[in-house]
């Protein structure tokens, strides 16, 4: 117990990865039960982190550091704040529900999901950039395997496009990482890749600009930002159901997390200088993604573009430079992960029963599967930001925070979200209440949800409603991380700008 207390975060990172290796020696049936037990233990370990997290304490918590290769600054250094804590929680919840849901090829999915869970725990906890980059890149491999092995049409093309886009873009970030490590050595006489050490560095204007661009490219493809999103519809729609869930619910959060952890605190002045073009890009994601979603005939592709559109709101919250906006962005990252997981699982159930996701093929499903229709409606309404749902809280706070920074664009973004309601409700009407084409017997006898599906989806609905009605559970620790991040941004921006610090106004909403 003493070891667990001292190294709890390391156990959270490496326990699922080591456990995944044991699954290689198990049967297909046994591996599913094994993966459920491991994922449940991992969730309990993350809840121990939650229980021990002190929102009154400044700085990183559960911090561990071990020198590995001192000469080149490679140290094992992990720690979390309120922002990282809830991405760990999201990761644990999503993986547990996925391993419960999995039906076929249980061993392959169990290994990939547990590996990816540990890798993502490392991404959200690493404070040494070499370890962060290693976890960042390795995360591609389990998803690439799932797409290439179990994907839909054009699975090889979709997998390779996803891999090449994200891998090559990340090489730009790697160049920036290596340069900063070398620059730290020139200034302090030794190399360091610890992000907390890097906060002490100042760069010349020219160097700073290309470093900012290098990091932004590597991060932008992962989110993805417009127009670097062209891999997304292929990967999301052609991946197996659980592959789509992992891509949209978790891997996209790696990008927005990197914006908060690295881009904003390392380059606060350039983040403000390029605020307008980045905000316009995010607005394009919301509007363009909404129109593309409305035009889709395939339900899974529609959900993919809907996910892309909503990530634009997260980006606006990140670049609000105030507590409300950043806290809203982090909350929406969690909410988006829960909602899009529900949407892709529901779409996967449709595909399993009907062997198609073409919206025009469906109709009148609500008659034969009323429970399925009810679950779909609740998740759908959360996706469009219905009040008292988890989707509303994140969108509202993100846009409210961005309104204080850029009122005009915030108003445009807020009104553009109406598109989400239009395309989601239209598709729902067609699938569940539309006219069924004659002779389509497979749809007319559509089977309702079974016990396992009801169990998984009930957890998602509980999260949607409980955290929508009582978001304070998440907002207090998130606010701690947001305030701490803004303090770093303010301190680093003072030598350069006199305006950014005036925008860092902490409006406390937790105690209202």
Locate the predicted segments by residue:
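Transmembrane helix-loop-helix hairpins at membrane boundaries of multipass inner-membrane proteins
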Residues: 1-8, 22-111, 194
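Helix-coil boundary and interhelical linker segments in multi-pass alpha-helical membrane proteins
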Residues: 2-3, 121-129, 260-274, 314-332, ...
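Structural signature of hydrophobic alpha-helical transmembrane segments
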Residues: 4-15, 80-91, 129-142, 208-221, ...
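C-terminal ends of transmembrane helices
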Residues: 19-28, 95-106, 145-154, 222-237, ...
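Alpha-helical transmembrane segments of multipass membrane proteins
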Residues: 20-24, 96-99, 118-125, 145-146, ...
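Alpha-helical multi-pass transmembrane bundles of energy-transducing inner-membrane proteins
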Residues: 29, 111-115, 119-207, 292-305, ...
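Juxtamembrane/interfacial segments at transmembrane-helix boundaries in multi-pass membrane proteins
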Residues: 54-75, 138, 171-229, 234, ...
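Predominantly late transmembrane helices and immediately cytosolic-facing juxtamembrane segments
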Residues: 226, 340-344, 411-445
């Amino acid at each position: 117990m003493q070891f667990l207390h001292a190294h709890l975060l390391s156990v959270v990172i490496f326990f699922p990865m080591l456990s995944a290796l044991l699954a290689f020696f198990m049967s297909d049936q046994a591996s599913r039960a094994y993966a459920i037990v491991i994922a449940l233990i991992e969730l309990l370990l993350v809840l121990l982190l939650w229980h021990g997290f002190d929102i009154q304490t400044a700085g990183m918590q559960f911090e561990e550091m071990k020198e590995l290769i001192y000469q080149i600054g490679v140290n094992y250094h992990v720690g979390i704040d309120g922002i990282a804590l809830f991405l760990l929680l999201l990761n644990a919840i999503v993986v547990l529900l996925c391993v419960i849901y999995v039906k076929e090829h249980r061993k392959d999915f169990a290994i990939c999901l547990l590996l990816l869970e540990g890798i993502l725990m490392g991404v959200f906890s690493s404070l040494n950039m070499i370890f962060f980059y290693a976890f960042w890149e390795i995360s591609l491999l389990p998803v690439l395997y799932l797409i290439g092995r179990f994907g839909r049409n054009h699975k090889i093309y979709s997998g390779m496009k996803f891999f090449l886009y994200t891998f090559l873009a990340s090489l730009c970030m790697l160049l920036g990482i290596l340069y900063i490590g070398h620059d730290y050595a020139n200034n302090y006489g030794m190399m360091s890749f610890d992000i907390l050490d890097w906060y002490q560095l100042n760069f010349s204007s020219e160097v700073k600009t290309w470093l900012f661009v290098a990091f932004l490219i590597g991060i932008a493809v992962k989110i993805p930002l417009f127009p670097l999103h062209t891999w997304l519809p292929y990967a999301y729609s052609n991946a197996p159901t659980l592959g789509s869930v992992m891509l949209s619910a978790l891997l996209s959060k790696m990008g927005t997390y990197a914006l908060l952890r690295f881009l904003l605190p390392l380059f606060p002045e350039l983040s403000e200088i390029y605020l307008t073009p980045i905000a316009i890009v995010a607005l394009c994601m919301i509007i363009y993604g909404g129109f593309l979603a409305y035009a889709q005939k395939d339900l899974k592709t529609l959900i993919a573009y809907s996910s892309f559109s909503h990530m634009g709101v997260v980006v606006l919250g990140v670049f609000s430079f105030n507590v409300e906006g950043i806290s809203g962005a982090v909350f929406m990252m969690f909410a988006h992960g829960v909602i899009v997981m529900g949407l892709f699982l529901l779409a996967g159930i449709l595909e399993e029963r009907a062997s198609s996701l073409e919206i025009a093929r469906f109709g009148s499903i609500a008659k034969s599967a009323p429970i399925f229709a009810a679950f779909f409606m609740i998740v759908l309404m959360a996706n469009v930001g219905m009040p008292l749902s988890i989707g509303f809280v994140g969108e509202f706070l993100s846009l409210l925070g961005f309104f204080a920074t850029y009122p005009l664009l915030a108003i445009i973004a807020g009104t553009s979200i109406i598109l989400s309601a239009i395309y989601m409700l239209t598709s729902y009407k067609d699938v569940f209440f539309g006219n069924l084409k004659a002779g389509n017997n497979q749809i007319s006898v559509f089977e309702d949800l079974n016990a396992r599906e009801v169990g998984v989806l009930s957890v998602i609905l509980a999260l949607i409603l409980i955290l929508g009605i009582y978001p304070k559970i998440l907002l207090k620790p998130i606010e701690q991380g947001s305030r701490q991040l803004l303090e770093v941004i303010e301190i680093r921006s003072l030598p350069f700008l006199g305006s950014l610090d005036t925008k860092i106004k902490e409006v406390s909403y937790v105690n209202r």
